[in-house]
């Protein structure tokens, strides 16, 4: 381009970009990586939300709240609300499967609902709502009956009567029904009421409400409470769906919102620090170039605009490349999860495009680059014309006296530290960049621990099959356990006894849920101890017991529990157990202690673990054995599919988090390498002078190593200090408050962090030193 064609100094931008293609490569790479990181994280989060929304709609239904204990008149008014899209009454009989309702040979739960139930539960496949005498039935009924739409099925009632119902459609969500080896029959309220009247069964009516799209869900709920005087206790939320809509007021979900916001903020900050540090170093290399422009008559404002637009010029390729890389990586991860992990991810979009991810990534790139270039632009504008003659200025080149005293005769080490600390802003950016990477690493590592607590089926005590007598009493003969253990397909069989007892503890009257463990269960419980020890033999007339941590359970090691004629002492606290939390503390004792306290020695439930969970014939054999032995008065639970899905989710979650941690580690290494390389390039002339006056190759290596080491140490100190604080806070919020496990210093993570940073420093030093040593001293001195 000739001088007559150049309309302004801005015309130099594409020329400079072409000439300095190699020098700009690392800066562009930093922008690409930052945009990629944000795009991938937010895109994957968007895909996960879409998947979970679809899963929850099919599994739990498309309803937002459920209201109970209201009059029919209030229900009619609620259904007519402008913001209500669907409204259905809902009643059920035998939801616990403890009564003798049978569809064929399988236990049945009955549901009565309005026509809108089809809209609220999209998994129900039926063109029209069931008419009188018709039912929607869970699709698992086809596993043992030849049933199609229009087929009549027999429903046996507890009084022995049998009525015939016609199948109008199927509910494809069979996870709960399969787990309990049962079927669910959904019918209109007229048919349901007739059956209830026939067997003189009482029932409660609840009401599902689905709000219209773009409704302020929280405000609508508050309006209903205020207008109709309905208390919060009478309104239940669809927690998952409300959470996915960012509308839940559940304390735990709100806490997860805060955690997600903090982690997302750190991801964005990591990108900002990376881009800012890179641009800062890039401009520092070219001080003499800007001084030359000042010699040619460019004003300070022109130089400032030149630097900013030059930075945006890099975004022309870097931002699209980062977005594309983020989208492709999201596609790859989604494809892997959907194709190789399991059915849980079958609704995950494979080739989905996330506007949220693209907008966040692009905005981060453009906005950060613009603002990140502001300070370097001001520095470039201050470059005096004389800089063009003297070359790139070296800030505070003189060694600090404290550095000299620290390293004594090792002048090269003092110089290296001085180079790192001479620019306070550059040191801050480098330290901040490393520290944020460490913060992210320590923060996301908490999620790996959290998922281990949250997903119970991955625990060693998780059963594949369970059986309980329909009354829920301790009536299962221990001989059954011996018979099951003798089967070659069974890995473990174990039972538990249960008894609620009135008790006095911590100065108050209440009750406890007493549960027995055998030897193998105590062996599994040992790893879940968060305080105390396992119970041994009774001493001094008191029985040692365990309790399970829960927010509502204040029992701790050393507390005593006074029963009517016995005294218990809590000797240990578990952070996890197979039991659902109740209002009463869970207390665990040995089978011998249970027998002495209650006089009972039969089990309430028997759990079975199989050697091969795919052996359908073995499962059928066990099912037949238990049903025949107990005369079918049992609730048989098959948890294999549910365990498999949650196990897949567990490993998939680990895969995603580990992949993200690897990306963080990779970006940290590249950032350190890039920053050191650009810092060395900015001082290339100074290094040439030092070599000319006698600095040998070994001293040069030590000097650059000292500079890189200073950045690494400052980043490690700040990152680990802040990271441990955040790690502890997240751990307490996500785990300690809900599972009771105490926080411990994550020494393993800290070791990985130190190794990664040290490896990055070694890599960062190698290339710049090699580049300097390969150049003649005269070429180094004359380089701009």
Language model segments and positions:
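Hydrophobic, regular-secondary-structure patches
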Residues: 30-105, 443-511
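Feature of multi-pass inner-membrane transport and sensor proteins
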Residues: 1-26, 285-302, 329-359, 367-452, ...
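Interfacial "coupling" helices/loops that link adjacent transmembrane helices in transporter permeases
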Residues: 20, 271-315, 668-710
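Short beta-strand boundary microenvironments
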Residues: 96-152, 166-175, 192, 199, ...
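A cross-kingdom feature of multi-pass membrane systems that activates on extracytoplasmic/periplasmic
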Residues: 201-202, 210-258, 620-650
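Short helix-loop junctions at transmembrane helix boundaries
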Residues: 48, 252, 323-360, 646-653, ...
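N-terminal membrane-entry
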Residues: 250-267, 356, 647-664
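Selective transmembrane-helix segments that form parts of the transport pathway or gating/packing helices
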Residues: 307-324, 397-403, 704-718
